[in-house]
């Protein structure tokens, strides 16, 4: 039932407050609501925030100038855990009085006509003084005396109650009437790495180099540890391994996904399980569990986290297929059903049937996950979570977080929006997205605005490629396209990722029209000579390193919620800015989407979006090239694909008094959703 005052559209809230919104430690979190009442009396509101441990505190909410029913506040959570907040709204008699006497004074009313207003003002300030501390109490009582002094000019008696000092005191110790409390909403706050992270994917088995005859040698955890030095130097935070478990022998796939393997074929890591073990074992050729623990330790020394693949499926010779046939679907002929996506068949993989023995499956998967957590793994990339029950994932993530809230789960869910965002709502920290297929200016703009608007729900990890996805733009766009896509991914989201080989411009598909790599690393060893490519100038590694450095140096690129697109008079150029409300750091990015031709145009800078005023001039510094320019509202840019595909301009810091408003949640006109 509605209260005395209306409190509507409280944000953030997810699925009717049945699930918590998302945030991380140190993130600027906007809170907003519609607060209203009848008549002309002013209303005010606070956000009442309760940390996981500690006392509740209040934040005064600001009203929009031209839409005063919209109220806003921001806060920065400083600890992990479940935060709660509610909106308290009330009738604000002091603001009502200030508005009334200001209008009457401007209308030229006399002291006699304002007598009742002065009397009411004295009463209000005396009431306010009673609840203020001593120093502020004296200020408020002094104002009451001035208002009551009929020997003073009218404007002096009115204006004494309108100063900024008075407003600050009354914001801190407001007079509140008809207090109405809104619903309690929840925000799940994770560690910062759930939002700010650069991922690099590599296959440990491909790190062994070649033998004397030029044949690939199976990598080990030891050779993988050596490869981590290069990954760390590029500035990545997380190194992700596809499954490191034993690979099935039965129905093993051959090179390029051929149905029959020949002697020496290593198979797909996603066909998990053999006589050597299942999801809790390591592939014998990679090493031992102790070797893996040493690898995790080495990664941490380099400032890297290791992410493991959690692929809940089994090869026909997985121990589960032998000991837990109830985990699968058994056909009429007594065989276990293999995976199918008609007309495709995957004879090397058995999908799990979660409804046959849910308790057994749930407990076994939890045991497997905690096995790796206890070995030092704090991040999991989950393979195809949208093909498993959503209540299972909610149960598993909640259960793991009971003891290990630091564990991050990335959903590899290339699926319909309801599934993708539904999985995010129930607990996945990050999600793959359709960024790979967003190539035009219009599509990129719509995509970026969508994901920033859904920051309470989902955190997009923008991978430029994966072992499964070599987009046509990379196949045909030349080397410049690799730089273009990297620049977009690294600056549009605080989460981005690269699959090994991207820096070598690997671009050949298995056949025309396919997004699969030729000689896919999913089915064979693919050692790479990164150093020779770097020495010969045939590597994107320096540019990727520079992008990660720029990201680390600029907090504006470490947040998801604030992105603003600027008009630029060329469909092949895209321009957008980001601002960090804590530091005031501001960045403006311009990218040439044409990988074969130079593009130029005039950019019309929306000055308010970067904390400036129209007509201002300001200095911009290109973090990529080092060049500096003096800019204004309208500026010329030109980008050449073989020289610089993007400008990443560092702008003047936004002054403190303009920062918070830039972090407010955008509420479109007439958006009155429940």
Segments and roles (model prediction):
Residues 232-256, 310-329:
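Carboxylate/His-rich catalytic cores and anion/metal-binding grooves
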Residues 315-326, 393, 402, 414-442, ...:
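Substrate-binding cleft/loops of secretory-pathway carbohydrate-active enzymes
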Residues 219-230, 357-372, 481-486:
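Short, acidic/polar
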Residues 397-412, 417, 439-514, 582:
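Catalytic-core region of carbohydrate-active enzymes that cleave or remodel glycosidic bonds
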Residues 322, 326, 330, 353-423:
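Active-site neighborhood of glycoside hydrolase catalytic domains
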Residues 193-219, 247-295, 322-359, 518-527:
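Aromatic- and acidic-residue-enriched carbohydrate-binding clefts of CAZyme catalytic domains
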Residues 198-200, 239-241, 306-308, 380, ...:
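Hydrophobic faces of well-ordered beta-strands that scaffold small-molecule active sites
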Residues 1-205, 209, 213-237, 299, ...:
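Carbohydrate-interacting/catalytic domains
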């Amino acid at each position: 039932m509605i209260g005395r005052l209306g409190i509507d559209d409280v944000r953030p809230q997810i699925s009717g407050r049945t699930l918590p919104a998302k945030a991380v430690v140190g993130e600027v979190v906007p809170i907003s609501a519609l607060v209203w009442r009848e008549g002309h009396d002013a209303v005010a509101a606070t956000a009442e925030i309760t940390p996981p441990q500690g006392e509740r505190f209040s934040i005064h909410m600001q009203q929009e100038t031209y839409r005063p029913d919209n109220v806003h506040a921001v806060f920065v959570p400083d600890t992990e855990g479940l935060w709660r907040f509610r909106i308290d709204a009330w009738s604000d008699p002091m603001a009502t009085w200030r508005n009334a006497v200001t209008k009457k004074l401007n209308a030229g009313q006399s002291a006699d006509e304002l007598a009742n207003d002065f009397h009411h003002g004295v009463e209000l300030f005396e009431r306010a003084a009673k609840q203020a501390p001593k120093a502020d109490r004296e200020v408020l009582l002094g104002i009451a005396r001035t208002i009551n002094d009929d020997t003073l000019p009218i404007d002096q008696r009115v204006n004494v109650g309108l100063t900024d000092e008075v407003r600050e005191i009354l914001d801190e110790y407001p007079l509140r009437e008809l207090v109405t409390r809104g619903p309690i909403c929840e925000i799940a706050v994770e560690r910062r790495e759930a939002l700010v992270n650069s991922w690099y994917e590599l296959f440990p088995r491909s790190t062994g180099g070649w033998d004397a005859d030029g044949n690939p040698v199976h990598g080990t955890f030891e050779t993988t540890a050596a490869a981590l030095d290069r990954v760390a130097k590029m500035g990545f935070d997380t190194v992700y391994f596809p499954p490191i478990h034993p690979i099935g022998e039965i129905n093993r796939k051959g090179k390029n996904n051929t149905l029959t393997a020949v002697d020496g074929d290593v198979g797909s890591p996603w066909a998990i399980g053999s006589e050597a073990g299942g999801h809790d074992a390591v592939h014998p050729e990679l090493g031992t569990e102790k070797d893996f623990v040493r690898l995790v330790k080495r990664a941490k020394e380099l400032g890297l986290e290791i992410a493991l693949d959690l692929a809940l499926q089994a090869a026909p010779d997985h121990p589960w297929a032998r000991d837990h046939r109830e985990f699968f679907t058994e056909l009429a002929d007594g065989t276990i059903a293999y995976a199918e996506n008609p007309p495709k068949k995957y004879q090397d993989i058995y999908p799990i049937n979660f409804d046959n023995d849910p308790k057994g499956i749930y407990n076994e998967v939890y045991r497997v996950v905690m096995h790796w957590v206890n070995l030092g793994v704090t991040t999991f990339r989950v393979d195809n979570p949208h093909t498993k029950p959503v209540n299972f994932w909610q149960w598993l993530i909640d259960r793991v977080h009971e003891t290990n809230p630091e564990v991050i789960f990335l959903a590899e869910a290339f699926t319909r929006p309801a599934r993708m965002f539904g999985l995010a709502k129930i607990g996945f920290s990050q999600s793959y997205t359709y960024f790979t297929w967003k190539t035009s200016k219009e599509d990129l703009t719509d995509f970026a605005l969508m994901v920033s608007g859904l920051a309470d729900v989902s955190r997009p990890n923008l991978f430029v490629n994966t072992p499964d996805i070599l987009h046509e733009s990379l196949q045909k766009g030349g080397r410049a396209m690799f730089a273009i896509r990297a620049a977009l991914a690294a600056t549009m989201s605080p989460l981005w990722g690269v699959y090994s080989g991207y820096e070598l411009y690997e671009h050949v598909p298995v056949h025309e029209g396919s997004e699969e790599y030729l000689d896919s690393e999913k089915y064979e060893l693919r050692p790479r000579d990164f150093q020779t490519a770097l020495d010969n100038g045939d590597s994107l590694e320096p540019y990727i390193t520079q992008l990660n450095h720029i990201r680390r140096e600029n907090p504006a690129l470490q947040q998801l919620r604030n992105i603003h697109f600027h008009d630029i008079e060329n469909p092949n150029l895209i321009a957008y800015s980001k601002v960090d409300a804590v530091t005031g750091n501001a960045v403006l990015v311009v990218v040439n989407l044409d990988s074969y031709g130079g593009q130029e145009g005039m950019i019309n800078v929306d000055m308010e979006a970067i904390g400036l005023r129209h007509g201002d001039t300001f200095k911009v510094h290109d973090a990529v090239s080092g060049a500096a320019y003096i800019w204004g509202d309208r500026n010329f840019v030109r980008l050449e694909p073989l020289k610089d595909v993007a400008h990443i301009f560092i702008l003047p810091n936004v002054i403190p008094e303009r920062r918070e408003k830039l972090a407010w949640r955008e509420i479109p006109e007439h958006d009155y959703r429940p």
